[in-house]
């Protein structure tokens, strides 16, 4: 079996919740596209990442069904695990930092593909949504919990044809998109209780950050 770390990314303050992320630290153990996609499908996490060069931060991101050029929660998790300041997913250079509690990456909203946000009138409406709601395409449902404070309640629904992931527990890329649309810093509670923080930059970039913890390690 491949050496595999499983992380929880965007944990709550008490360390609970967070979105599971599979990390294969030595990408050479899955050298081709087919073996990587098969392992990502077998694990069934929102994303599994293969590290091709840990010093340079070269990584390959997979959902159970496809390869991704960019994704938020995998890169936040990897920045924490590898303790490096720059990552190299297919989209290009992504800068990272750690402030002692939260790990942050800096991204551009145009890197976020095939997602849309939808505002609801109340937190209760968001929490009452079935998983997934009717329709097709990636939906980030959200409502203000406290608009003055920038606190948001959100849920994420991939609504992909394969139906493997009914609801995403914490979605960094969707949080980036919402932050760009609102042009303000946000404190997002997503899913069962995961926490995502964001901050827009003057140059159009968005910082997204959260807590990361080990869930399991397999060898």
Feature names for model-found ranges:
Residues 1-219:
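Active-site proximal loop and beta-alpha junction motif in alpha/beta enzyme cores
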